[in-house]
């Protein structure tokens, strides 16, 4: 670890030395013989960058990337961290107040994040952030990020490879190869991906129960994880004419993960120790997934027609062996096998209408998930359960332009038939039929130099299939985890306000949620010594207000581009805790301060800071966390690009803390996992062309649930 600290500090010093050297060169005018040309190019970029890069339209915030400093930033996820209302948390993209978005690239839905990770900034034309999706999208989708790439032409073979090497406690690496062959109107494409890594983490749990006496269970755990990912994708796209195109692809991925853990537990009753236990746990997890996606897009007169379909199969196998030592050794094993499948299709049509358009469509999804668990020498019983769902949705909407005013109004009707089987027999108490109408409406208007968008939507959150399973998972001697087949969907009413004025972007959202799904802490059996974590529907409604302001002044001093965003999430919620009403309404404050430095000789440096305060989310108290990341990138040629980065240089994001309050119990969880890492990314491309695949995909949210 000391050697890693030394390497990180040395790497940070090198980056700052290069930044300082480039600033000195820029200020003194000592560069190369082409300095005048570089200055002219830089001056042109400055002129374009001083214009607002983000504008607001009827969908959401649209940010121009082509021809701006953002196209030199590196990769798509680096660009997203600079967008208003978007957070980049160590590669995990979130829309503020909306959670993880659904990605679209050139109209087709992204099902593998490798595609987003491979996308380079200079391939992007624009990015649209939608915080209140229209009726066309499933009621469970809270936000969308749509990426439009620069249209490229040219036939022949293209090759694009990205290799990543890094150190985070241990060395890790991944490689992604993108191949494409284009001839006339036919595209044949394929991707291959491989990842391998090793990491360590630790956790500490303190469980408190206030019954006739005070019980406390203390648990510490250290784990080492080995992971791999092998991914392949092959497909084609054919455009017989400008009015007709179709295509399909097949994708397969295999992800084996092995985790070894050592656990120390102790039980206290009124501060008097009753027992101590040590345990060793080995988990082997293997995921195999197959996906077939296809689309057809056509124009018939003034009608725009689209059809998409998806077929997915997934198998998960988990073997868990535990050795507990409590004076005598107890060895037991748990085997869990899961099978999931999905069939989804969407039909969509739109037509010009009055001063806008009119559109309608139908979504159909049929999915199932079956889980079989076997327990050997354990008090946890084996389970066999199956969930089968049929989802049929109809939607219609219209968008009209009236001078400086644009309004969109629509509705979506969803019919869901959910059937729950235990041991092959249908359980009617846990089977449900839902029929619900979800309206959406938005109004956009220009007031002077200010663009304002006000929208309303009704949304739904359906439990993940794993949250509905009654299978019990072993965490440690005093803590188990399971799903809850009695969970109901939660529904929310959302009012959103987006505002854009010159260099200021403001996003605000208020929502009220009924049947909020929260984490509960109960007991596994009548002995009340083993806690059980599971999800349940809250009896109290939850209201939530989110506001974020982003300041983007453009270029300063011709080489510096800052983006400062400050946001607050405040919930209004109360729970029953230890016989009293507890208000969990401490706000969460989020700050991001991203900085781009552009220099001569194709150098680009970034210094990014992010921080989240302590506060409440649902019935959980979250601790504060923050980090600083540095990077330096250079285009060596038109084919080669190198990027060096140091993440979490002060190791401040290593620890995350949570406290869950539930009934007469609470549990404090402290997780420590290394985020700090040094990384080198090397990219080589040859005759790159972007695939013309236009499939939008169907049933994305249902796949996430599976």
Segments from the language model and where they lie:
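Short, acidic, small-residue-rich periplasmic hinge/interaction motif at the N-terminus
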Residues: 28-69, 89-90, 98, 130-131
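Transmembrane beta-strands of outer-membrane beta-barrel pores
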Residues: 163-169, 183, 194-198, 252-256, ...
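Face-selective signature of the C-terminal outer-membrane beta-barrel domain
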Residues: 229-257, 280-423, 446, 450-451, ...
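Extracytoplasmic beta-strand/coil segments of soluble accessory domains associated
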Residues: 54, 77-109
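N-terminal periplasmic accessory domains that precede
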Residues: 44, 76-79, 113-114, 129, ...
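Short acidic/polar hinge/loop motifs at secondary-structure boundaries
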Residues: 82, 108-134
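Outer membrane beta-barrel strand-and-loop segments of large Gram-negative receptors
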Residues: 342-346, 393, 488, 505-565, ...
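Outer-membrane beta-barrel signature, preferentially recognizing the C-terminal barrel domain
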Residues: 386-389, 429-432, 460-514, 532-545, ...
């Amino acid at each position: 670890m000391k050697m890693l600290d030394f390497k990180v500090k040395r790497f940070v010093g090198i980056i700052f030395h290069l930044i300082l050297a480039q600033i000195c060169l820029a200020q003194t005018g000592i560069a190369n013989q082409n300095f005048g040309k570089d200055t002219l190019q830089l001056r042109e970029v400055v002129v374009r960058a001083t214009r607002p890069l983000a504008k607001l339209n009827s969908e959401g915030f649209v940010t121009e990337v082509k021809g701006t400093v953002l196209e030199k930033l590196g990769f798509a996820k680096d660009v997203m961290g600079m967008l208003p209302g978007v957070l980049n948390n160590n590669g995990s993209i979130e829309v503020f107040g909306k959670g993880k978005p659904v990605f679209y690239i050139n109209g087709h839905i992204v099902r593998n994040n490798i595609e987003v990770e491979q996308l380079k900034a200079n391939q992007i034309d624009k990015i649209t952030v939608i915080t209140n999706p229209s009726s066309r999208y499933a009621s469970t989708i809270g936000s969308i990020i749509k990426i439009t790439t620069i249209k490229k032409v040219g036939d022949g073979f293209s090759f694009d490879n990205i290799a990543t090497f890094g150190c985070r406690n241990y060395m890790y690496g991944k490689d992604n190869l993108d191949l494409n062959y284009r001839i006339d109107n036919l595209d044949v494409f394929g991707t291959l991906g491989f990842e391998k890594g090793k990491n360590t983490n630790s956790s500490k749990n303190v469980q408190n129960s206030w019954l006739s006496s005070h019980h406390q269970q203390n648990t510490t755990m250290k784990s080492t994880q080995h992971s791999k990912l092998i991914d392949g994708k092959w497909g084609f796209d054919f455009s017989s004419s400008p009015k007709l195109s179709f295509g399909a692809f097949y994708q397969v991925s295999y992800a084996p993960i092995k985790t070894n853990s050592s656990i120390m537990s102790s039980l206290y009753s009124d501060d008097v120790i009753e027992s101590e236990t040590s345990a060793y746990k080995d988990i082997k997890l293997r995921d195999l997934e197959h996906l077939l996606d296809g689309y057809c897009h056509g124009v018939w007169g003034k009608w725009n027609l689209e059809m998409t379909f998806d077929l997915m199969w997934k198998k998960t196998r988990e073997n868990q062996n535990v050795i507990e030592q409590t004076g005598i050794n107890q060895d037991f094993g748990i085997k869990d096998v899961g099978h999931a499948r999905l069939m989804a299709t969407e039909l969509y049509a739109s037509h010009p209408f009055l001063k806008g358009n009119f559109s309608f469509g139908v979504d159909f999804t049929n999915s199932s998930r079956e889980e079989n668990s076997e327990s050997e020498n354990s008090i946890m019983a084996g389970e066999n359960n199956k969930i089968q769902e049929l989802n049929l949705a109809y939607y219609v909407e219209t968008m009209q332009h009236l001078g400086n005013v644009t309004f969109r109004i629509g509705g979506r009707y969803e019919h869901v038939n959910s059937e729950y089987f235990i041991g092959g027999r249908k359980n009617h108490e846990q089977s449900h039929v839902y029929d619900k109408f979800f309206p959406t409406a938005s109004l956009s208007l220009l007031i002077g130099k200010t663009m304002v968008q006000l929208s309303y939507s009704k949304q739904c959150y359906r439990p993940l299939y794993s949250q509905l399973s009654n299978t019990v998972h072993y965490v440690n001697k005093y803590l188990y985890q399971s799903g809850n087949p009695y969970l109901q969907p939660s529904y929310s009413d959302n009012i959103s306000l987006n505002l854009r004025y010159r260099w200021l972007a403001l996003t605000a959202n208020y929502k009220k949620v009924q049947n909020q799904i929260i984490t509960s802490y109960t007991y596994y059996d009548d002995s009340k010594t083993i806690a059980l974590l599971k999800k349940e529907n809250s009896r109290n409604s939850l209201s939530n207000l989110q506001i974020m302001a982003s300041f983007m002044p453009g270029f300063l001093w011709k080489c510096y581009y800052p983006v400062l965003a400050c946001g607050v999430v405040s919930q209004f919620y109360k729970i029953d805790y230890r016989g009293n009403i507890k208000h969990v309404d401490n706000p969460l404050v989020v700050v991001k301060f991203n900085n781009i430095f552009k220099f001569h000789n194709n150098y680009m440096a970034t210094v990014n800071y992010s921080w989240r305060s302590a506060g409440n989310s649902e019935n959980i108290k979250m601790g504060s966390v923050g980090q600083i990341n540095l990077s330096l990138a250079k285009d060596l040629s038109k084919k080669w690009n190198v990027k060096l980065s140091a993440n979490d240089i002060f190791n401040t994001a290593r620890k995350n803390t949570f406290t869950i309050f539930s009934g007469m119990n609470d549990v404090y969880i402290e997780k420590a996992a290394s985020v700090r890492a040094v990384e080198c990314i090397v990219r080589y491309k040859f005759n790159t062309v972007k695939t013309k695949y236009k499939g939008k995909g169907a049933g994305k949210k249902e796949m996430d649930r599976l």
